[in-house]
From Swiss-Prot:
Keywords in alphabetical order: Cytoplasm, GTP-binding, Ligase, Magnesium, Metal-binding, Nucleotide-binding, Purine biosynthesis
Binding site for GTP: 25-31, 53-55, 62, 307, 313, 339-341, 425-427
GO terms of molecular function: adenylosuccinate synthase activity; GTP binding; magnesium ion binding
Cofactor: Mg(2+)
Upper classification of the organism: Eukaryota, Sar, Alveolata, Apicomplexa, Aconoidasida
Record InterPro entries: Adenylosuccin_syn_GTP-bd, Adenylosuccin_syn_Lys_AS, Adenylosuccinate_synth_dom1, Adenylosuccinate_synth_dom2, Adenylosuccinate_synth_dom3, Adenylosuccinate_synthetase, P-loop_NTPase
Chain sites annotated for binding Mg(2+): 26, 53
Protein name: Adenylosuccinate synthetase
Family indicated by similarity: Belongs to the adenylosuccinate synthetase family.
Quaternary structure (record): Homodimer.
Encoding gene, per UniProt annotation: ADSS
PROSITE patterns documented for this protein: ADENYLOSUCCIN_SYN_1, ADENYLOSUCCIN_SYN_2
Length: 439
């Protein structure tokens, strides 16, 4: 379905569509972004860095993308790295070289995005070691994301635009690195080698670094189809997520407007991606986590290992109070439900439909969410039980082909969150997707 030219229920079509994760990441956003990129003219990343990981399966081939938008897989697509990204150019070059086919011709980078240096990754590792000694490790990807955003917030970071003038960049670089080496007592760091690398990046990228605000707004006004790709997910938002167990950028709807320089009235449609169960990487509260054979089953069958870190993900039942909250802050119009096939083979499946206060027995108001760890500990999940199914559903191409119990599960989710579920993932590839019709 070409979502840019197709209205669904009370949701009007439009030329600017955003895809956002509704949980703790790893919902399978990459697949729906890949499907919709076929119809878009421009695909944009607005936040984060190499800590994101989108795995796209095209036939027998897997593409793991960390910085590049998923639109790079389509030759008709221009791909933009936005203002609020932090970009490790060594990682970006590796992705570009792995994909080949003149990918660089279709990439533009915001002059306002910040450069992530190797020293940021060293600092990330140092900070995690220090926190782990106190039992307070966040479980970061150690990709340098937090330290890079820290230098940005401290106003000593270096933007991509500075790389266009290498002599000026060199002065800024030496000042920054000397500052960080002194601050973190780093004795050995090869500045000369990294500067040589960055001279190469200067030659490669100097004409690809642009004012994306002007570019995107002109494209929107000329009715180009714009697909906006969220990295990480809502519950990892630096302000609105389960702080401090979050990422370092704004992952929710508000991040789009600063990350791309567009105003809210230009955004037509928001697609929320919901995994059929729940996963989390690293530390942090997780009320529906299954530390048992169910959790192990979901990890193995769902191949729940981080695209970036390769760490096994923690697994549990779908948490609807989380979705109610995320729907409020993201104004979600339609849903893509992913990885329904992973639940095949379970005798019973549970959905958390409410949070109940352990002391008072009161149910949490829907749309509210206890983000602080101490608050969350006051609640326990209230489950609704569903009968499972044994059938392999990976070859289902229409909703009616699903087993009755699978259909009941999907319709129950849709009923609770009062948002149409348009796409249902039933396997890893583009073709393993059911598109429901609402005409």
């Amino acid at each position: 379905m070409n979502i840019f030219e197709h209205s669904i229920k009370n949701v009007d079509k439009g030329n600017v569509v955003a895809i956002v994760g509704t949980q703790w990441g790893d919902e399978g956003k990459g697949k729906i972004i890949d499907i919709l990129s076929k119809y878009s003219d421009i695909t944009c990343r607005f936040n984060g860095g190499g800590n994101a990981g989108h795995t796209i399966c095209v036939g027998d081939k897997k593409h793991a993308l960390h910085l590049l938008p998923c639109g790079v897989l389509y030759e008709n697509n221009i791909n933009i790295l936005g203002n609020c990204m932090v970009i490790h150019l060594k990682t970006l070059m590796k992705e570009i070289n792995n994909l080949g086919n003149n990918i660089l011709d279709r990439i533009y980078i915001s002059e306002k995005a910040h450069i992530l240096f190797d020293i940021h990754q060293e600092i990330d590792a140092i900070q995690e070691i220090r926190k782990s000694k106190d039992g307070n490790a966040i479980g970061t990807t150690k990709k340098g994301i937090g330290p890079c955003y820290s230098t940005k917030a401290s106003r000593i970071g270096i933007r991509m635009g500075s790389l266009r003038n290498f002599e000026n960049f060199k002065k800024l670089y030496i000042k920054l690195i000397d500052n960080l080496m002194d601050l973190y007592n780093i004795k050995d760091y090869n500045k000369e080698e990294e500067l040589n690398e960055f001279y190469t990046y200067h030659l490669i990228f100097k004409d690809k670094i642009i004012n994306i605000i002007s570019y995107i707004n002109k494209s929107i006004d000329s009715k180009k189809y714009i697909l906006i790709e969220g990295a990480n997910a809502a519950m990892l938002d630096i302000d609105l997520g389960t702080y401090p167990f979050v990422t370092s950028s704004s992952t929710t709807l508000g991040g789009i407007f600063s990350g791309l320089g567009i105003h809210h009235k230009k955004l037509n449609l928001v697609v929320g991606v919901v995994k059929s169960y729940l996963t989390r990487v690293g530390s942090g509260p997780f009320l529906t986590e299954q530390c048992n054979e169910i959790g192990e089953y979901l990890t193995k069958k769902g191949f729940e290992y981080g695209t970036t870190t390769k760490r096994p993900r923690r697994c549990g039942w779908l948490d609807l109070p989380m979705i109610f909250y995320v729907k409020y802050i993201n104004c979600i119009d339609i849903i893509n439900l992913t990885k329904l096939d992973v639940l095949s083979g379970l005798k019973e499946i549970y959905i958390c439909i409410d949070y109940k206060n352990k002391t008072t027995g009161e149910l949490l108001e829907r749309g509210n969410y206890p983000l602080e760890y101490e608050q969350l500990r006051e609640y326990e999940p209230v489950y609704e039980k569903f009968e499972g199914w044994d059938e392999d559903i990976t070859n289902c191409i229409e909703f009616y082909e699903l087993p009755e119990n699978a259909k009941k599960y999907v319709l129950a989710i849709e009923s609770y969150i009062k948002t149409p579920i348009v796409w249902i993932g039933v396997g890893p590839t583009r073709n393993n997707t059911i598109t429901r019709k609402f005409d």
